[in-house]
Amino acid sequence: MIESKTYAVLGLGNGGHAFAAYLALKGQSVLAWDIDAQRIKEIQDRGAIIAEGPGLAGTAHPDLLTSDIGLAVKDADVILIVVPAIHHASIAANIASYISEGQLIILNPGATGGALEFRKILRENGAPEVTIGETSSMLFTCRSERPGQVTVNAIKGAMDFACLPAAKAGWALEQIGSVLPQYVAVENVLHTSLTNVNAVMHPLPTLLNAARCESGTPFQYYLEGITPSVGSLAEKVDAERIAIAKAFDLNVPSVCEWYKESYGQSPATIYEAVQGNPAYRGIAGPINLNTRYFFEDVSTGLVPLSELGRAVNVPTPLIDAVLDLISSLIDTDFRKEGRTLEKLGLSGLTAAGIRSAVE
């Protein structure tokens, strides 16, 4: 039996459209917010969110569409944050005065360190203590080409999920499990943070396709942008991520293992994984270098990975090289602007101290 709850969906980009449609079609009350009032108006004028594609299809009617974040948050049982991870901090500051004890906040996904950053900012803004969850990746493979429409190519079969405090994960899954059975509890948010495969699959391939992105010639990001050599180098970046996790006594999946868990594939290489994934057909590459594959996945992926590696004395030469090359390429000091350990509330902590902070 599906239990009805009220879900706030904050952010109506690709993933937010998919979440709002999915939950409404599951019979849940959906309070949807976006900062862009014009986008909200266009969805209101359309009268619904139309979901299309092999992953999800139907006409969904959220109970509320608003650009007033307080209206969306104050009466929700579960608050789903579905904005680029670089905006998590501002969302936390903006909702701090509206949230109340007993609410569940989930970052979809948290990238690396999302729940930790969110908790720190809520506390700094005087918010009550609430449970903050995060997933390791986005549930949907989807694209919204215009307000009120979303194409859902696939829904992942399983999603790593953890909470702050770590012991609240079971309670959280009791709240959402009837509509989000894909969420599977792992040890803690350090595990979900170190299972951030976007940090492997986005910055490096985009860097190696920079000329193609700037040329304006359309290309399929995964199917054409990740060649055997690009995939092979991504596997070496992935090995550094896994080494960091092992230093924290965490067993996180490799990217290839993640594809098996998420999509039911059994690839031997990253190249095989992307070529064999029908959900990636038609996903276009960036048309310039002002892309979230840099600004989000370097800031909230490579930066905290590099800093976590340094904290536990794990060398990350490839992660550092990609981070620094992209910083120089687009004249952005990601090491300053990104998610540093200080911004996560972990500055100066040992491996044991960091593990304690995520309990």
UniProtKB/Swiss-Prot annotation:
Key words, A-Z: NAD, Oxidoreductase
Domain of life: Bacteria
GO MF, one example: opine dehydrogenase activity
Pfam families assigned: ApbA, Octopine_DH
InterPro entries attached to this UniProt entry: 6-PGluconate_DH-like_C_sf, 6PGD_dom2, KPR_N, NAD(P)-bd_dom_sf, Opine/Lysopine_DH, Opine_DH
Record bears the keyword Glycoprotein: no
Entry EC number(s): 1.5.1.28
Regions crossing the membrane: none
Family the UniProt entry places it in: Belongs to the lysopine/nopaline/octopine/opine/vitopine dehydrogenases family.
Subunit annotation: Homodimer.
Name this polypeptide is given: Opine dehydrogenase
Origin species: Arthrobacter sp. (strain 1C)
